[in-house]
From Swiss-Prot:
Disease (UniProt): Mucopolysaccharidosis 7: A form of mucopolysaccharidosis, a group of lysosomal storage diseases characterized by defective degradation of glycosaminoglycans, resulting in their excessive accumulation and secretion. The diseases are progressive and often display a wide spectrum of clinical severity. MPS7 is an autosomal recessive form with a highly variable phenotype, ranging from severe lethal hydrops fetalis to mild forms with survival into adulthood. Most patients with the intermediate phenotype show hepatomegaly, skeletal anomalies, coarse facies, and variable degrees of mental impairment.
Family: Belongs to the glycosyl hydrolase 2 family.
Originating species: Homo sapiens (Human)
Record NCBIfam families: PRK10150.1
Protein name listed in UniProt: Beta-glucuronidase
């Protein structure tokens, strides 16, 4: 396979649609248990960007065959982080092509000597195309950032005498093309009076910086050779009882026994089961409720799965514990229901974005963001515009923050992006998203795209197929995409369960004219609802605001203008939110980095918080509104009386 093209995927050879190890089996979050161990590889890795003209030197010289430092200089690179903002090298910040990471690891002796132990290498995210070598052996490839992939490397570490070190080499290409998600194009600038020979730029069609690298944790973990591969849980409610339906996949042997226990928050066993599938009934159930919707939100049970099996080397056992929230989701023509009760999304859109670390996962930032969400009175957010780290989803389960889980289908702006290769890849990405996040009670809806060119006929077929595929993967949740098209021309809207609309009245349209917002917003809602008869979420609205800019009367880019724009939107939303508008998500939670342009001052400034998480004036306005909305319907019902409506769609 030819690899290492400067800017195009064509030289990579055929993409591995599902044949790579990283796309097989389950994707349970790694955890330690009596049968499992984890070894995190976060920290400093050796790093090199391939600045050669064709970006292929690393493959031509086979950098993966020996330690990276032997083939040239390396620098320290923290993992997890984006590589772009770590150094003072301007070339690296805007680099397009292959970068190389390497780390040497000493393994515990038991991992290499006990043949009943399976050793797995897991990469939380590598944006965007990754090739992995272990001790110079080509082990794994994966296309697409923002999602985990892994490989069983037991046969590489359990050979001969104990290897003193394990060398992991990862090459990552961040090039975006018409068949990647998100898509992009490469433009060669050939006027030699302005540009040197071979000069090119990466064009993107989305408004956030294309950070890249090992942006989430890398780790090794073990399981027995016969192991719990995957668990799928769906829940429902029957009078005052909760029903937990489970399916368990086991790999490595057909001779095994499974025991299942469901424990409540006090670690008391409330139900038992056996076998690979079954139903657990929980009398007097404590439901999983969103934040501010119940006096005890985010109630989680623990599903404990114990496997015992016979192998040729003797008996083995495996243990895995899955948090379970028992709740229902349903959609009617005018309501979004959680546990049979109307739910109103009052929340934010976010980005995984911060100073220095870029899109790199960071625990302090995560906790700070959730503290701000709760202070704000937000009960929901959309993972705009890609799946967030698994730790984020776990926090949502624990805190009761509802999630619209969006894939990286952003920037689908050109007709050539709606091709069969892209469609195949998009459907596979949705498989990976659902596989990873299907058991999170906080996830109540899938979003397959943001602002696609949904007025195109080709987009209509494309979206129809992706939505249908997602529904086949998970019939228990509604599916949407986020539109900014005209209601009469949108070819994808007939296939969604909930209409999600982005509009920027008085900003991108009729900018400066705050007095038009209420009329234009009312017209928008009425047109969409009359045509489609589906609940509507105002999925984006907002205004660019430079913290500390003030002007009265309000002028654009000032804090006063952002506040005034929000106030006008809120008046318009209040006219419809007791009818068929079921949510509002501000754009954006915090300022974030974008590509440089004459219209962006160090990034997008539509946040109600700065990039450093300090509030602008609008944050206090939004906090007052969200707490007011929450208090209108706060704790109006008991758990025992909460049931999903019989005529709802997703039970």
């Amino acid at each position: 396979m030819a690899r290492g093209s400067a800017v195009a995927w064509a030289a990579l050879g055929p993409l591995l649609w599902g044949c790579a190890l990283g796309l097989q089996g389950g994707m349970l979050y790694p955890q330690e248990s009596p049968s499992r161990e984890c070894k995190e590889l976060d920290g400093l890795w050796s790093f090199r960007a391939d600045f050669s003209d064709n970006r292929r030197r690393g493959f031509e010289e086979q950098w993966y065959r020996r330690p990276l430092w032997e083939s040239g200089p390396t620098v320290d690179m923290p993992v997890p982080s984006s590589f772009n903002d770590i150094s003072q090298d301007w070339r690296l910040r805007h680099f397009v092509g292959w970068v190389w990471y390497e780390r040497e690891v000493i393994l515990p002796e038991r991992w290499t000597q006990d043949l009943r132990t399976r050793v797995v290498l897991r990469i939380g995210s590598a944006h965007s195309y990754a090739i992995v070598w272990v001790n110079g052996v080509d082990t794994l490839e994966h296309e697409g950032g923002y999602l985990p992939f892994e490989a069983d490397i037991s046969n590489l570490v359990q050979v001969g005498p104990l290897p003193s070190r394990l060398r992991i080499t990862i090459a990552i290409n961040n090039t975006l093309t018409p068949t990647t998600l998100p898509p992009g194009t490469i433009q060669y600038l050939t006027d030699t009076s302005k540009y040197p020979k071979g000069y090119f730029v990466q064009n993107t069609y989305f408004d956030f910086f294309n950070y890249a690298g090992l942006q989430r944790s890398v780790l090794l973990y073990t399981t027995p050779t016969t192991y719990i591969d995957d668990i799928t849980v769906t829940t429902s409610v029957e009078q005052d009882s909760g029903l937990v339906n489970y399916q368990i996949s086991v790999k490595g042997s057909n001779l095994f026994k499974l025991e299942v226990r469901l424990l409540d928050a006090e670690n008391k066993v409330v139900a038992n089961g056996t076998g690979t599938q079954g139903q657990l009934k929980v009398p007097g159930v404590s439901l999983w409720w969103p934040y501010l919707m119940h006096e005890r939100p985010a109630y989680l049970y623990s599903l404990e799965v114990q496997l015992t099996a016979q192998t040729s080397l003797g008996p083995v056992s495996d243990f895995y514990t899955l948090p379970v929230g028992i709740r229902t989701v349903a959609v009617t023509k005018s309501q979004f229901l959680i546990n049979g009760k109307p739910f109103y999304f009052h929340g934010v859109n976010k980005h995984e974005d911060a100073d220095i670390r870029g899109k790199g996962f960071d625990w302090p930032l995560l906790v700070k963001d959730f503290n701000l969400l709760r202070w704000l009175g937000a009960n929901a957010f959309r993972t705009s515009h890609y799946p967030y780290a698994e730790e984020v989803m776990q926090m949502c389960d624990r805190y009761g923050i509802v999630v619209i889980d969006e894939c990286p289908g952003v920037g689908l702006a050109l007709p050539q992006f709606f091709n069969n290769v892209s469609l195949h890849h998009h459907m596979q990405v949705m498989e990976e998203v659902v596989r990873r996040d299907k058991n999170h009670p906080a996830v109540v809806m899938w979003s397959v795209a943001n602002e696609p060119a949904s007025h195109l006929e080709s987009a209509g077929y494309y979206l129809k197929m992706v939505i249908a595929h997602t529904k086949s993967l998970d019939p228990s949740r509604p599916v949407t995409f986020v539109s900014n098209s005209n209601y009469a021309a949108d070819k994808g809207a007939p296939y969604v369960d909930v209409i999600c609309l982005n509009s920027y009245y008085s900003w991108y349209h009729d900018y400066g004219h705050l007095e038009l917002i209420q009329l234009q917003l009312a017209t928008q809602f009425e047109n969409w609802y009359k045509k489609y008869q589906k609940p509507i979420i105002q999925s984006e609205y907002g205004a660019e605001t430079i913290a500390g800019f003030h002007q009265d009367p309000p002028l654009m880019f000032t804090e006063e203008y952002q506040k005034s724009l929000l106030e006008q939107y809120h008046l318009g939303l209040d006219q419809k939110r007791r009818k068929y508008v079921v949510g509002e998500l501000i754009w954006n939670f915090a300022d974030f980095m974008t590509e440089q342009s004459p219209t962006r001052v160090l990034g997008n400034k539509k946040g109600i918080f700065t990039r450093q998480r300090q509030p602008k004036s609008a944050a206090f306005l939004l906090r007052e509104r969200y707490w007011k909305i929450a208090n209108e319907t706060r704790y109006p019902h008991s758990v025992a009386k909460s049931q999903c409506l019989e005529n709802s769609l997703f039970t």
